[in-house]
Amino acid sequence: MASKAHPVATTAAADWRDFLALTKPRVLTLVVFTGWCGLLAAPQSIHPVLGFTAVLCIALGAGAAGALNQWYEADLDAMMARTANRPLPAGRMDRQSALHFGVGLGIFSVLLMGLALNVLAAAILAVSILFYVVVYTIWLKRRTPQNIVIGGAAGAFPALIGWAAATGRVETLPVLLFALVFLWTPPHFWALALFINSDYARAGVPMLPAVAGQRATRIQIMLYTVPMVIAAVAPWAMGLTGAIYGIGASLLSALFLLLAAQVGFSREADPARMKAERRLFGFSILYLFLIFGLVVADKVLA
């Protein structure tokens, strides 16, 4: 059983950098990019000011979800080396401030999206925030090793939101992009979990390597990569994108599959020597940036 740990007492007033850290800026970058690509890939364009507003709302909504995640998980963050210096466990901010910030940011983002763009985009944004905070953070993360599988839906919403903001509809292409991110999430996070497993185990988070072991995790990474690759090339196969996307996505997905296979067949047990796992984790981030970039490039250049 994991030892108990609590955030240290707040010693100083939080500054703007602490509030920014609550939004998880690194995660925010990918979320905003996929939302922006969903907006640009839509068949009809919108005024640049409205487009900027839509992307801003996606960023604020994702930031709100990140803040509420850190509010709820302050005790876990205090036990994990990679999160111990976050504002709450480090004592630079009190939990009530984080809660108020997250709730306020979330409400503002949804209201602004609804008033400036349309109700559908605002509704999907609201669902994405609630899904990440309630379903993933509060309900799943501490209870099941499948937490990241189901919770992965939260990170898959931005492309849907961007498309809906531009069109007021949800159509096949953004749904396929949603499926792609949903299926990408387990290999991405399980690759990370393999080489920081001790952090999760110390905090008592039932990530797959800690519960089912390394071998089962490696197999699951390969099993999820196959349908992810199918989802990645499906837009081209269905005639929703052109050759620019299709060829690029096929090559990138083949490389992803190769890296996943290297992880799957690896017998390395020492986290410090897990090069294949680190390669897959690093490439998986680049992969998603490039895939979504290809969606936009295909529309602009075709």
From Swiss-Prot:
- Where is it predominantly found? membrane
Q: Which residues, by range, are in coiled-coil regions?
A: none
The topology of this chain with respect to the membrane is: Multi-pass membrane protein
Q: Name one GO biological process term.
A: heme O biosynthetic process
- Top-rank taxon, per record: Bacteria
Location of this chain's protein in the cell? Cell inner membrane
Q: Which GO terms describe its molecular function?
A: protoheme IX farnesyltransferase activity
Arranged from A to Z, the UniProt key words for this protein are:
Cell inner membrane, Cell membrane, Heme biosynthesis, Membrane, Transferase, Transmembrane, Transmembrane helix
Q: What class of enzyme is it?
A: transferase
**A single GO CC term, please?**
plasma membrane
The transmembrane segments are 27-47, 48-68, 97-117, 119-139, 148-168, 176-196, 219-239, 240-260, 280-300
Q: Name one Pfam family in it.
A: UbiA
Reactions that this protein is recorded to catalyse: heme b + (2E,6E)-farnesyl diphosphate + H2O = Fe(II)-heme o + diphosphate
Query: In which pathway is this protein known to take part?
Result: Porphyrin-containing compound metabolism; heme O biosynthesis; heme O from protoheme: step 1/1
- E.C. numbers: 2.5.1.141
Q: Describe its function.
A: Converts heme B (protoheme IX) to heme O by substitution of the vinyl group on carbon 2 of heme B porphyrin ring with a hydroxyethyl farnesyl side group.
Family label: Belongs to the UbiA prenyltransferase family. Protoheme IX farnesyltransferase subfamily.
- Other comments? Carbon 2 of the heme B porphyrin ring is defined according to the Fischer nomenclature.
Q: What is this protein called?
A: Protoheme IX farnesyltransferase
Q: Upper taxonomic classification of the species? A: Bacteria, Pseudomonadati, Pseudomonadota, Alphaproteobacteria, Sphingomonadales
